[in-house]
């Protein structure tokens, strides 16, 4: 960021604090950015949808912001990018990524509230954004790899497994983050293509959780286990993995369809005000790619540029629904609203027929 761009974010925050509103009531007018500062965000998102699938923006003045300030500023930035998605059982739109004593590979476990190293995975939005407020004492290194490179390597080593990865017989746990009218697990291939755009979605932890927690879910075949094992061998390879140390004031943005990400375990500081802390936004964006039709079961919509993604959770409010509709209109994005593609009853029929 240039000094001019930083000043734009600072002035917008000053305005937002002088005219305070709940986050879900805010529009761009409540966080007014000058053109030079808007362009930073627009260029970053454009970069995620291009060749690299990722972007790192450095220099946000987080040391001058309180935690509450950063939440307002970060949400304000998102208003220029897309439509924020709910991220957990509590239906929160900004997640605090820090060690809150959670466990990772357990029923209902999520990675963002632990200090554990994470499996390579994709988040449930067109773009996942992390803004670093504080770093760990040691560890927490961010790792990113191309899912296109992953597919190409599978094609070299085990081309017979590509059709397995692209099949729709994969079941994954929602980890208790679904709406009450949704089944507790969903189907989604691990790889696919639509309109010339490749996409991947893999998170072995959630695939295994569906096997562990739901006896009615069809058991993984030998070929499916082989495919998962092969991915686990390829993904951490230094040949394919880009490593970065996120610093205070860094914003990392990732395209969830063409990148996978992870981080190493970390050791935190003792004092609460020194512990590792990042904030996470999940964003549906107007320039997103099309998805294969069967991916709509999880994503809610497979159309390019449509509002989709997120996990519904159990605490959706009318305020969020109004925000979602208003922000979709501002961004020019089609929005179907929430209606499960597959209901609990329909899923029972699906698994009984597999």
Annotate each PLM feature.
Residues 71:
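Classical protein tyrosine phosphatase
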Residues 67:
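Catalytic palm subdomain of template-directed nucleic-acid polymerases
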Residues 74-84:
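A short alpha->loop->secondary-structure connector
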């Amino acid at each position: 960021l240039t000094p001019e761009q930083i000043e734009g974010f600072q002035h917008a925050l000053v305005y937002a604090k002088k005219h305070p509103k709940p986050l879900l009531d805010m529009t761009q007018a409540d966080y007014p950015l000058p053109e030079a500062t808007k362009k930073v965000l627009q260029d970053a998102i454009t970069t995620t949808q291009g060749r690299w699938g990722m972007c790192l923006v450095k220099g946000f003045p987080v040391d001058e912001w309180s935690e509450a300030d950063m939440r307002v500023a970060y949400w304000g930035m998102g208003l220029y990018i897309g439509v924020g998605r709910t991220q957990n059982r509590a239906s929160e739109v900004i997640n605090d990524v820090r060690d809150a004593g959670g466990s990772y590979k357990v029923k209902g476990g999520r990675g963002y509230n632990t200090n554990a190293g994470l499996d390579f995975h994709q988040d449930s939005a067109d773009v996942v954004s992390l803004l670093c407020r504080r770093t760990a004492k040691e560890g927490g290194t961010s790792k990113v790899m191309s899912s296109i490179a992953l597919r190409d390597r599978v094609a070299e080593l085990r081309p017979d497994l590509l059709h397995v990865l692209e099949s729709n017989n994969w079941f994954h746990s929602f980890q208790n983050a679904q709406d009450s009218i949704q089944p507790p697990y969903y189907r989604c291939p691990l790889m696919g293509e639509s309109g010339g755009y490749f996409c991947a979605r893999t998170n072995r932890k959630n695939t295994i959780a569906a096997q562990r927690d739901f006896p009615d879910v069809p058991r993984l075949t030998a070929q499916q286990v082989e495919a998962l094992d092969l991915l686990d061998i390829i993904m951490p390879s230094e040949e394919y993995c880009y490593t970065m140390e996120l610093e205070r004031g860094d914003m990392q943005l990732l395209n969830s369809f063409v990148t996978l990400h992870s981080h190493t375990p970390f050791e935190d500081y003792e004092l609460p005000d020194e512990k590792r802390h990042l904030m996470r936004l999940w964003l549906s964006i107007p320039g997103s790619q099309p998805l294969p039709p069967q991916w709509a079961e999880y994503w809610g919509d497979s159309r390019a540029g449509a509002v989709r993604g997120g996990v519904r959770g159990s605490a959706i409010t009318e305020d969020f629904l109004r925000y979602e509709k208003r922000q979709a209109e501002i961004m020019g994005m089609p929005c179907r609203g929430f209606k499960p593609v597959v209901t609990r009853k329909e899923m029972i029929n699906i698994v009984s027929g597999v």
